[in-house]
């Protein structure tokens, strides 16, 4: 917590991450409740639960894209505004009955969750550049704690907002849009200070499959040094826990 007071850039990034993660979490459980209001609730809820899981499948791909992004601060800000626009569209769609509108909401929800992961990946190099090496572990740990707290409190806040608004899904989506808007606006104020090391493009571009295989082998060799058996099962368990979290 002392790091927040000592490092203004870290405090700013933490505030932005808090607003973005809270915004992403608020609608996740509300989305399932919205699905339950569909004409065929059992089918819709099943689809909604699957939709919430899907962004986790793109985590590696999104992370690699974030690493390769050159102007990270610019995209960090732009994406927050884009998410605000997406949730304004979601707010409008929730007023339209039927599965067509529900399908559009599902798609926009997937896109927004993937963008939140992308923003998280963009923040890491900025943190590494602006935070002393001896404080990096504390900063990363605080980020993980912040994400967990936002995930739990955000869903609770979403249900509470839904209850006091008498299931006004459009209102909750609009509040989500505001959180994303604020998340980017607070970064825009100090955009020039959000620096990072230059991104070096690889000499030869490998396919996504090749890079995933290389990443898998590197991770496997690391765990092999620690004498961890059944690495494949362990990796699957970690991905599943991350998705459920």
Task: List where the protein language model places each region.
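Juxtamembrane intracellular "pre-TM" segments in multi-pass secondary transporters
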Residues: 1-10, 192-233
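Substrate-agnostic recognition of the 12-TM MFS/MFS-like secondary transporter fold
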Residues: 12-28, 51-64, 73-83, 104-163, ...
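MFS-fold secondary transporters
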Residues: 36, 89-93, 112, 186-187
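Short amphipathic helix-loop junctions that connect adjacent transmembrane helices
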Residues: 29-43
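Small-residue hotspots at the loop-to-helix junctions and early N-terminal turns
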Residues: 39-49, 141
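Helix-loop junctions on the cytosolic side of multi-pass membrane transporters
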Residues: 173, 177-203
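A helix-boundary/kink motif common to multi-pass secondary transporters
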Residues: 40-41, 70-74, 101, 132, ...
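C-terminal ends and interior cores of transmembrane alpha-helices
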Residues: 81-99
């Amino acid at each position: 917590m002392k790091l927040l007071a000592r490092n203004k850039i870290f405090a700013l990034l933490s505030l932005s991450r808090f607003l973005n993660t809270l915004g992403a979490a608020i609608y996740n459980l509300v989305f399932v409740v919205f699905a339950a209001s569909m004409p065929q609730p059992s089918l819709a809820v099943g689809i909604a639960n699957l939709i919430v899981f899907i962004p986790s499948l793109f985590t590696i791909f999104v992370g690699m894209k974030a690493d390769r992004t050159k102007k990270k601060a610019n995209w960090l800000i732009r994406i927050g505004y884009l998410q605000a626009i997406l949730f304004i569209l979601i707010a409008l769609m929730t007023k339209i009955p039927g599965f067509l509108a529900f399908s559009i909401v599902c798609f926009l929800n997937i896109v927004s969750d993937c963008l939140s992961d992308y923003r998280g990946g963009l923040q890491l190099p900025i943190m590494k550049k602006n935070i002393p090496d001896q404080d990096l572990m504390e900063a990363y740990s605080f980020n993980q704690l912040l994400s967990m707290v936002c995930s739990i409190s955000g869903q609770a806040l979403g249900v509470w907002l839904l209850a006091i608004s008498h299931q006004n899904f459009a209102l909750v989506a609009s509040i989500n849009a505001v959180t994303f808007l604020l998340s980017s606006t607070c970064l825009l104020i100090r955009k020039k200070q959000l620096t990072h090391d230059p991104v070096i493009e690889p000499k030869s571009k490998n396919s996504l499959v090749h890079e995933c295989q290389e990443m898998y082998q590197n991770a496997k060799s690391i765990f092999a040094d620690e004498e961890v058996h059944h690495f494949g099962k362990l990796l699957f368990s970690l991905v599943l826990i991350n998705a459920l979290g």
